[in-house]
Regions:
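Structural and coupling elements of P-loop NTPases
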Residues: 1-695
Length: 695
């Protein structure tokens, strides 16, 4: 593989909605460049970037994969990113290491929620953008309609650059607005042809869009354009390059990844006009780990080395691969690597370029390039590697919070260590997955971005590490309390031949009404009817019992127990006897005090477009939720509601289905409320009640 200096590097991420042809587009680019003998198909499991067995089985991308494409003396580092929202974590990392986001849009369906979110993510990372209207060979493909939709949505920055010749089955070539030439044919067989008469009007209209935006990208060009109404071809190209870099020009191109039409001309645009890492200047901002001061690094070979690890591949057979982007300096096998976040020095175990799963050995890489290193001992995704003499640390990747959790158990008893060590390895690959221990239920929770996401983790655990796990809905941390005041005696008497056991207490159980969930104990004994040294045993017995309620074994809350009377035996009374008497009083008293079941109520905020308001609100009502209010917000309407946790476990998946993936939500604990009688009956019937033996 050739050696490419910084100015000849182009780093791009293919992003957008799922099933709109990003992986097929990557294959077409590789085939056009002569890097594969035949173009793979997602349906057949033969693509270079969908190499994971899970991707082959599911016929969709679930991990970001790189595919460097050599084209006209440039290297285009393509990062093929999954489009489904369950795998959004795989998009966040690559966007940190590219200059341009290429958003793929379907030529029939048009702008999708995945494309809109991709636009927002790219903008948040300050990237240049381009739209590819793919699948122009399909029936009902309509470039004019989709490009007009994009201009209406995002403004005049959107400029059609490659116009289609024909559409649907007759799509045979493209018109390049920039050089005002027409081309027919697929892949490298794309050749110049005379400009069709019926395209000249559309060409000049789009050319005028291009001139205006090229002029707007540069103040000097704008002044000349206002004065003369013209720009030279070289000036237009310069304005186009600058507009691509700062986002003031967003080209739109027509291609068919399946047939290869438009692919070569699209690659020409990327090679000629996409920004290289050198164009970003003082772009990479970090901090000095020793002082906390801000540091910038210029993406040049003569700068101190620094790199950012954006992805990790954990393989049980070949070990760990760390995928990185060089932000400054050069990397060779002799480069000393320092991880400032871990304060560790790493030994480079080999430098590679990855094309799918294929590893190409490299002696060195230039500033701005993307590569991989093997067997880094301490380094994880989001870490910085740098020159130890010139340390810098870049901001870590901020992954979206998990929106679904499942309790995870080993499928076979005794394999717990195998399961959880495997999950830890998979979390190195995918930091958007988390493991946590619920202190209430003591379950281990596996959390991620959706049901498919967690199912993929479960499948990978089995295929990669031979560990099988079971995923279940988490237990609900119900509570129990009482609604009325009762007075009850707890009397424990047992004669066994020697010293007996005797304890006698009268306790008043009442609800706590000040909003506190505490268990309150009050000593109201007078006259020594219960000796002072036994009163702590009564309190201890009550508190131990109240860990398990009388209805379904859930902890009691908001209960006051007042010890106000009792009796004792000078010989047979003991701490244990009074502790047992307190337990008897608790069971008798709370059972008669109108015990009720409480459930956690969550504060939920859902953001949706106006089109889906009715469906979302109706669904919330079906979940026993209450709509508290609505607010106008960026991106649509915010619905504020409260709903029981038990009804919200699959809400992330259901909301995506209801809103065509437009909706998003946040959820936090609010308070406990009484469970409706019909629901409580089912919970109590299915609960594993704790059986206490008073003996």
């Amino acid at each position: 593989m050739a050696d490419y200096i910084t100015t000849n590097i182009r780093n791009i991420a293919l992003i957008g909605h799922g099933s709109e042809g990003k992986t097929t587009l990557t294959e077409a680019m590789l085939y056009a460049a002569g890097l594969v003998d035949r173009q793979g198909r997602v349906e057949d499991g033969t693509t270079m970037t969908d190499f994971d067995p899970e991707e082959t089985r599911r016929k969709c991308s679930i991990s970001a994969a790189t595919a460097p494409v050599d084209w006209n003396g440039k290297i285009i580092n393509v990062v093929d990113v999954p489009g489904y929202f369950d795998f959004v974590g795989e998009m966040i990392g690559p966007l940190r290491v590219v200059e341009t986001a290429v958003i793929v849009v379907d030529a029939v369906g048009g702008l999708s929620v995945g494309a809109e979110k991709a636009w927002d993510y790219a903008g948040a990372h300050g990237l240049g953008r381009m739209f590819i209207i793919n699948q122009m060979d399909r029936d009902h493909a309509d470039f004019d309609k989709i490009s007009s939709q994009l201009r209406a949505k995002y403004g005049n920055c959107v400029v059609p650059i490659l116009l289609p010749l024909g559409k649907g089955p007759t799509f045979r070539g493209v018109v390049n607005v920039l050089d005002r030439k027409a081309y027919e044919g697929a892949y490298k067989k794309s050749v110049e042809v005379p400009m069709p008469e019926n395209m000249k009007g559309q060409l000049m209209e789009c050319y005028s869009y291009l001139i205006e935006q090229a002029a707007a990208a540069d103040e000097e060009l704008m002044e000349k354009y206002f004065e003369t109404g013209e720009l030279t071809f070289e000036e237009i190209k310069a304005g186009f390059r600058k507009g691509m870099k700062d986002g003031s020009i967003v080209p739109v191109v027509a291609v068919s990844a399946a047939t290869g039409v438009g692919i070569a001309r699209m690659l020409d645009l990327m090679a000629k006009y996409f920004p290289s890492p050198a164009h970003n200047g003082l772009y990479w901002a970090g901090k000095d780990p020793r002082t906390g001061e801000d540091i910038t690094r210029i993406c040049k070979d003569d700068q101190p080395f620094s790199a950012f690890v954006y992805k990790t591949i954990a393989d049980p057979f070949v070990g760990k691969l760390s995928l990185f982007r060089i932000f400054s300096g050069m990397l060779s096998g002799q480069t000393t690597l320092y991880n400032p976040g871990k304060d560790k020095t790493e030994k480079c175990g080999g430098i590679y370029i990855l094309r799918g799963k294929k590893q190409v050995v490299k002696e060195s890489l230039h500033a701005g390039d993307i590569g991989a290193m093997a067997k880094l001992q301490y380094t994880s995704t989001g870490d910085t590697l740098c020159d130890p003499a010139n340390p810098v640390i870049y901001p870590p990747i901020e992954y979206p919070k998990p929106c679904i959790s499942k309790a995870v158990y080993a499928a076979k008893q005794g394999e717990e260590d195998k399961v959880f060590s495997g999950l830890q390895r998979l979390m190195e690959e995918d930091p958007s997955v988390t493991l946590s221990k619920d202190p209430e239920t003591m379950e281990t929770l596996l959390s991620g971005q959706g049901e498919m996401h967690l199912d993929v983790i479960r499948s990978k655990l089995a295929s990669k590490f031979g560990a099988n796990c079971v995923l279940k809905d988490p237990k609900i941390p119900y509570r129990e309390t009482i609604r009325k005041t009762v007075k009850v005696q707890g009397r424990h008497k047992k004669q066994t031949g020697g010293h007996g056991q005797f304890g006698d207490v009268w306790i008043e159980f009442s609800p706590v009404t000040d909003g506190s969930t505490d268990i309150v104990f009050e000593d109201a004994v007078v006259g020594g009817v219960v000796p002072r040294n036994f009163i702590p045993s009564v309190e201890k017995g009550l508190r131990e019992c109240m860990v398990h309620g009388v209805l379904a074994g859930y902890p009691m809350v908001s209960v006051k127990a007042k010890l106000y009377d009792g009796s004792y035996h000078p010989v047979d009374s003991s701490e244990m006897a009074f502790k047992t008497a307190a337990r008897i009083a608790y069971k008798k008293g709370c059972a008669d005090a109108n015990p009720v079941l409480l459930e956690p109520i969550m504060h939920v905020e859902v953001i949706v477009s106006d089109d889906y308001m009715g469906d979302v609100m109706g669904d919330m009502n079906k979940r026993r939720g209450r709509i508290i209010g609505m607010e106008q917000c960026e991106g649509g309407q915010k619905i504020i509601a409260e709903a029981p946790l038990s009804e919200m476990f699959k809400y992330a998946t259901d909301l995506r289905s209801m809103t065509q993936a437009w909706g998003r939500f946040t959820m936090t604990f609010e308070r406990y409320e009484e469970v409706p009688a019909d629901v409580a009956k089912k919970v109590i019937a299915s609960a594993d009640k704790v059986v206490d033996d008073d003996e």
